[in-house]
Every structure is written in structure tokens, then in C-alpha cells.
From Swiss-Prot:
Gene Ontology BP annotations: cell wall organization; cellulose biosynthetic process; plant-type primary cell wall biogenesis
Name of this chain's protein: Cellulose synthase-like protein E2
Active site: 155, 458
GO cellular component, one term: plasma membrane
A GO term, aspect molecular function: cellulose synthase (UDP-forming) activity
UniProt similarity note: Belongs to the glycosyltransferase 2 family. Plant cellulose synthase-like E subfamily.
Amino acid composition bias (Gly residues), ranges on this chain: 1-14
Top-tier EC class: transferase
Record membrane topology: Multi-pass membrane protein
Pfam families (alphabetical): Cellulose_synt
Record keywords: Cell wall biogenesis/degradation, Glycosyltransferase, Golgi apparatus, Membrane, Transferase, Transmembrane, Transmembrane helix
Region described as Disordered: spans on this chain: 1-20
Species for this entry: Oryza sativa subsp. japonica
High-level lineage: Eukaryota, Viridiplantae, Streptophyta, Embryophyta, Tracheophyta
């Protein structure tokens, strides 16, 4: 069956010193961290003890008793989740590669060939110029072009995407030698010309401006074709590939197409300097309206099969179409892990972190990417397995295609597809491998390739690879390997997290649960690491409880925390101060500012009470066979005014959604409770009345402070990104009765 070419089982020889090093933090630093964590855990235990030993009596209406029990349940969960997160962070590791040793140990001819997969699905949502900038960036890797094979999967089967790829194949003849001659970084032409305003060292102004003009001309032609929707006659006459499209073609109903635009085996496939070009292949798998196509997972599996007959490289790298290569040496870095004879035999994939170029300083959405990349993921790596992101990942083909690791197995890095056929025959073979019926009654998507039947197919695929005995590696080089685009509106971000949360929750409730699938196969610490995300959804209810019930009790004068003068006040204060101080220190250590840390805390709260909550509801509705709630936003903010507001630190709302209603309701409720609660205490009891309600008052004030962008969007802003009046009206309908009942009580 297509997909892999087998390996060889034989002894190996160590070629000199190691190709990579694994480093751990200093003992003193880890000891200090663990002592700090131990003191916080002691505080958590004291909080649990206080809740259990000071349970209010059940007299009266029992409101305080029930509220107290709810606080106990929430704090039990927060404590458990904190311990889970802490356990994962117990043994971080950091990787360092030695590319100079790689060059000494392996000649260029001995290095393996690499198949690179780029996936796109919609030319409207993913503009063709964005796609080809990514394609050109990976075509220009600092690697032998004869050993590079780039495959573009176009699930829409769009003739526009094919036309743009044809344009890119011509531009590559100029761009690739320019990049290699002057060591250009990054090698996405769009990113390079946007960032660099002058020629690189050694390049004359005339040559640089000529290259820039070539790129501008291509961009103008592409944009003209995309805007008109019509393909010029010249490319149609000169490329046999265009003849496969007809008026009956749609994105959901079209035959399979495989076109080899550049064949590195042919003498004519050279750049302007006469050097070979990488192989470039366009693929659109067959689509039929009533046939399941499994989205991105199906696309990747189709690429695995097509590549197996054209190139069959032992290394596969896949990248999303909006995440270009920012480091031309990423392949060589990844090979340092795979080709190390002593340490690399069991490495199944090497995962690079996700980084984004459009995140501004003091980002209002507090993207925690630095902390995640610098702290969280190295800790997962320390337990023997970074998860598979779905992009920016180098795979061992054999591991991806289902091979179980054994110590006797040794990879044949020199193997390639045994090509005796010409391009036409290869294309015909490729088309037969990507029909709608090819996978019927096979193990594709079950035991082979990327997994089907789960929302986060990349995560479950990586987990299954690890359960087969393979190890994964996380590598975060100084110069980022890949750069992409992240959403810059609140709605887009919350929908994205809702999708991720649903996926992780469904994995946790299925046979793919790390504790079930990974039992006895991967370390307990790694199982817990996967579960940190798997339990995102569970955080929603305790968090929603904690930001509403204490505030309502404060408004009613019901105390849920110890007095400021009580000894029991100390563990509450210590846990809060110590935990947030540690979080701030970690954020600053990773290069974030204090403002970015504060914004990240806001988004942490917002995600828990919106994305996580609705993801949980939708997941259980699906389990019960009830239709989904339909809370997902579909509006995408792309206009220049919205981008300007983002750069100014203004949250982008702009449309009605259930998520915004929940967020606004919580914000208005706490504002009302703070104002009315403090007024009630001062008028009825004086300043001394706050002694018993001090922590609740602080909590209420903090929630109000963290929701300041919501109040700004409600009361001060009048732009298109502000909160709609309909959101405010619905929220007031929830808040007003609660406040009236409390006041009249």
C-alpha cells in the first residue's frame, strides 16, 4: 500500500560527536522553584482545611452554606489543576543542535531527501499570495534542491491556486538563487520585502530593485487574476494542467488532480544560474458531496500517498499555508536530531514552536506564546514527548505511517522512490491514490497516517506515534523556524479557543484519552501534560462560579472568606500573591512586559468563562445527540480600521455573540456589586464593616479592573469595534434582576 517505502534493519556506526545536546536548568534554580511550589501547595492545603472546618451551619435560608460548599468545590478543582500543571513543569529540558558537526559527519549527498507538505483549502479565506509566499520560503531552504520536494494540497481544487502556483514556479527561478547567493532571511518574498528596505551585503542596488520589481509584477498579475476570477490565455496555453478544469468544477465536487510543475529529475528544471530547482507538485484530491473527506487529516494522508510514488523521502515536513519559513536552516537543525546515531534512533518527529509576526508590543489579547514556547513546551519535552501541533513539524515517514519502534530498526536515509516512470505516468499513479474510494477498507486514518474521527487529528496522531515507542523532540531555536498570523479580534480568538477546547475535551472523553491510550506506553508525566489542555473545559464552571457568587454575596453582606485579622487570612493572601508573583516573574523572564502579563491574565479569565464554557456545553450536547448551540462567530475582521484599533490596544468586538453576552454580563455584574456593595457597607456599618468582607471586596475590584476594556467598549467607544447595544441590553436583563433581589432582600 502506498505511503512508506520500508527501512533497513542493520547495525549502525557512530559518526563522531553528538549532533545535539539536551540541557537542563541549574540545580539551584530548580530547587528554588520547587521550594516555592511546596510553600504554595502548603497554602492550598490550609485553604482546603479552612473550608472543611469552618462550614457554616445550615440554619436560615442556607445561602451562605451552599455558597461556601460551592467555593470549596471550586477551590478543590483549582488546587488539583494547579498540582497537575506543576507536575508537568517538574523537569524542563532545552535542546541545542550542532550543524557544524552534521556537516562533518555527513556529506551533502548522504543527507536524506525531504518532502514538504503545504495545505490550503479555500482561496478566499487563504489568499493565494499568502500561500505562494509560504511555498517559495520552503523552496528556498538552504538544502540541496535535488533533495527537496514541495507538495501543495489544494482542497478547494481552485484553478486560481493552480495558476498562482504556476506563477510562483517561474518566479522561483529568480528568487531561489538570489536567496542563496546573498543568504537572505526570511525567504518568504512577501515578508522579506516588507521588512527589508535596502539591499543585503554584496548585492548591488540594481540587482536588488530588479528582484523587488519582479516580485511586484508577479503580485500585480496574481491580484488582477484573483480579483477578476479569470485565468489569462497565455498560461492556459502553456500549461497542460489547466485543461483539467471545466465549468462543472466546484470546491466540493471535482476529480483528483496531480500536476508536477517542476521535476528536479529533468535537465530543464533549473534556475537562471543553471542550478537544479526543487520538485514542485500540485495536488487536489477528489471530492464528492456525499463522501467524507476528513478535512486536513485526509489531505495530509493523500499527500503521504502521492509523495510515496514521486519522491518517497524518509523525512516529511508539513506546514500551514499561512506559516512561512523564517529560518533557512530549519531542515539541518531537524536532521541533527534524526541523524544522531546514538540519541536519535527513536525520534519520531521534531516539533518547532508556533510564532506570529503580527503580534504587537503590549498586545491587548496577551498572547502567552513566549511563556508557552519558553517554559511549558520544554517541560513536556522533558517527559519524553512534545505534542504534534499540525504545522512546523518534521516527521520520520516510517513513524507517521504506523511503524512501531524497535531497537533493531535502523532508517535507510538514502532511500527515494524508485522512479522509472515519466511525469505523466507518475501523475496518473498519483491521481489513483487520492480518489474518494481509495481509503475504503484500509487502515488509513486508523493505524496509518494522520488519524480520523477526532477533532484535533494532529494531537491524537502525535500521541499515537509516541505510544508506538517513538520519542518526539521540541526545538525552539533563537531564530524562529516559522512565522504565521494570529487572529487580532476577540471574536476570532475566542472561537479558535472554543474549537481547541472542544477537541481536547472530546479526546479526553474518548478512547484517545492520554490516560487510556498512553497507559503503560508513555510516562505518567506526559499523560498529565496532555491532560492540562484536556481539562481546559472543566475550568469553566469553577471560574464562572468564582467571578459571580462571591461578588453577589459581597453585595448581600455574606462573608465567604476569613477576616483580615484572622490567621486563616494568611494562606489565602499568600497563595494569591505567591502564585501571581511567580507567574509575573515567568512572563518577564520570557521577554514579556508587565502589561502583556496583565493582558494575558485578562484573556485567561475571558477564555474560561466564554470559550471553555460553550465548548463544554456543545460537547455534551453532541454526546446527548442534541444539535449544537450555534454560538460560533463567523465574522472575520480584516479591515484596516480594525487593525489600527488593535495596534492602539483596543479590543475588537463589533458583533453580537453569546460569548460577548457572557463576558459583558460578568463585567456589569461585578461593577454593580462593587459599587452597591461598598456603598451598602459604608452606609450601614462604616469602614469597619469591610473587615469581614475584605477579600471579597478585593476580588470584586480586581475583576472590575481586569474588565476595563469591556467597559470602554460599552460606555466610551463609538467605533465599529465597540460592543453592540444588543449585547448590553441582554446583559442588563440578566444583571438587573439579581441586583434588585439583593437590594430588596
Amino acid at each position: 500500500m502506498a505511503g512508506s517505502g520500508g527501512g533497513v534493519v542493520s547495525g549502525g556506526r557512530q559518526r563522531g560527536p553528538p549532533l545535539f545536546a539536551t540541557e537542563k536548568p541549574g540545580r539551584m534554580a530548580m530547587a528554588a522553584y520547587r521550594v516555592s511550589a511546596a510553600t504554595v501547595f502548603a497554602g492550598v492545603l490550609l485553604i482546603w482545611l479552612y473550608r472543611a472546618t469552618h462550614l457554616p451551619p445550615g440554619g436560615g435560608d442556607g445561602v451562605r452554606r451552599w455558597a461556601w460548599l460551592g467555593m470549596l468545590a471550586a477551590e478543590l478543582w483549582f488546587g488539583f489543576y494547579w498540582v497537575l500543571t506543576l507536575s508537568v513543569r517538574w523537569c524542563p529540558v532545552y535542546r541545542r543542535t550542532f550543524k557544524d558537526r552534521l556537516a562533518q559527519s555527513y556529506s551533502e549527498d548522504e543527507l536524506p531527501s525531504v518532502d514538504i507538505f503545504v495545505c490550503t483549502a479555500d482561496p478566499t479565506a487563504e489568499p493565494p499570495m499568502l500561500v505562494i509566499s509560504t511555498v517559495l520560503s520552503v523552496m528556498a531552504y538552504d538544502y540541496l534542491p535535488e533533495k527537496l520536494n514541495i507538495y501543495l494540497s489544494d482542497d478547494a481544487g481552485s484553478v486560481l491556486t493552480f495558476y498562482v502556483l504556476c506563477e510562483a514556479s517561474e518566479f522561483a527561478k529568480h528568487w531561489i538563487p538570489f536567496c542563496k547567493k546573498y543568504k537572505v532571511e526570511p525567504r518568504s518574498p512577501a515578508a522579506y520585502f516588507a521588512k527589508v528596505a535596502s539591499p543585503p551585503d554584496g548585492c548591488g542596488p540594481k540587482e536588488w530593485f530588479t528582484m523587488k520589481e519582479l516580485y511586484k509584477d508577479m503580485t500585480d498579475r496574481v491580484n488582477s487574476v484573483v480579483n477578476s476570477g479569470r485565468i489569462p490565455e497565455v498560461p492556459r496555453c502553456h500549461s497542460r494542467g489547466f485543461s483539467q478544469w471545466n465549468e462543472n468544477f466546484t470546491s466540493s465536487d471535482h476529480p483528483s488532480i496531480v500536476q508536477i510543475l517542476i521535476d528536479s529529475n529533468k535537465q530543464k528544471a533549473v534556475d537562471i544560474d543553471g542550478n537544479a530547482l526543487p520538485t514542485l507538485v500540485y495536488m487536489a484530491r477528489e471530492k464528492k458531496p456525499q463522501k467524507q473527506h476528513h478535512f486536513k487529516a485526509g489531505s495530509l494522508n493523500a499527500l503521504i500517498r502521492v509523495s510515496s510514488v514521486i519522491s518517497n523521502s524518509p523525512i516529511i515536513m508539513n506546514v500551514d499555508c499561512d506559516m512561512y519559513s523564517n529560518n533557512s536552516e530549519s531542515i539541518r537543525d531537524a536532521l541533527c536530531f534524526f541523524l544522531d546515531e546514538e540519541q536519535g534512533q527513536d525520534i519520531g518527529f521534531v516539533q518547532y514552536p508556533q510564532n506570529f509576526e503580527n503580534v504587537v508590543h503590549n498586545d491587548i489579547y496577551g498572547h502567552p506564546i513566549n511563556v508557552v514556547n519558553e517554559l511549558d513546551h520544554p517541560c513536556l519535552d522533558g517527559w519524553g514527548g512534545m505534542c504534534y501541533y499540525g504545522t512546523g513539524c518534521f516527521h520520520r515517514r516510517e513513524a507517521l505511517c504506523g511503524r512501531i519502534y524497535s531497537q533493531e530498526y535502523k532508517e535507510d536515509w538514502t532511500r527515494v522512490a524508485g522512479r522509472t516512470e515519466d511525469a505523466n505516468e507518475l501523475e496518473e499513479m498519483g491521481r489513483s491514490l487520492v480518489t474518494c474510494t481509495y481509503e475504503h477498507n484500509t487502515i488509513w486514518g486508523i493505524e496509518k497516517g494522520v488519524r480520523y474521527g477526532c477533532p484535533l487529528e494532529d494531537v491524537t496522531t502525535g500521541l499515537q506515534i509516541q505510544c508506538r515507542g517513538w520519542r518526539s523532540v521540541y526545538y525552539n531555536p533563537k531564530r524562529k523556524g516559522f512565522l504565521g498570523m494570529t487572529p487580532t479580534s476577540l471574536g476570532q480568538i475566542l472561537v479558535l479557543y472554543k474549537r481547541w477546547t472542544e477537541g481536547f475535551l472530546q479526546i479526553s472523553l474518548s478512547r484517545y484519552s492520554p490516560f487510556l491510550l498512553g497507559h503503560g506506553k508513555i510516562k505518567l508525566g506526559l499523560q498529565m501534560g496532555y491532560s492540562v489542555c484536556g481539562f481546559w473545559a472543566v475550568n469553566s464552571f469553577p471560574t464562572l462560579y468564582y467571578v459571580t457568587i462571591p461578588s453577589l454575596c459581597f453585595l448581600n453582606g455574606i462573608s465567604l472568606f476569613p477576616e483580615k485579622t484572622s490567621p486563616w487570612f494568611i494562606p489565602f493572601a499568600y497563595v494569591m500573591v505567591a502564585a501571581y508573583s511567580c507567574s509575573l516573574a515567568e512572563s518577564l523572564q520570557c521577554g514579556d512586559s508587565a502589561v502583556e502579563w496583565w493582558n494575558a491574565q485578562r484573556m485567561w479569565l475571558i477564555r474560561r468563562i466564554t470559550s471553555y464554557l460553550l465548548a463544554t456545553i456543545d460537547t455534551f450536547r453532541r454526546i446527548l445527540g442534541i444539535s449544537e448551540s450555534g454560538f460560533n462567530l463567523t465574522v472575520k475582521v480584516t479591515d484596516l480600521q480594525a487593525l489600527e484599533r488593535y495596534k492602539k490596544g483596543m479590543m475588537e468586538f463589533g458583533s453580537f455573540s453569546a460569548m460577548f453576552v457572557i463576558l459583558t454580563t460578568v463585567a456589569l455584574l461585578n461593577l454593580a456589586c462593587m459599587v452597591l456593595g461598598i456603598s451598602r457597607v459604608l452606609l450601614q456599618e462604616g469602614p469597619g464593616g469591610l473587615e469581614t468582607l475584605f477579600l471579597q471586596a478585593v476580588l470584586c475590584v480586581l475583576i472590575v479592573a481586569i474588565n476595563s476594556p469591556v467597559y470602554e467598549a460599552l460606555f466610551l467607544r463609538r467605533d465599529k469595534g465597540s460592543l453592540p447595544a444588543s449585547v448590553a441590553r441582554v446583559s442588563i436583563c440578566f444583571v438587573l434582576p439579581l441586583c434588585i433581589l439583593s437590594i430588596c432582600k
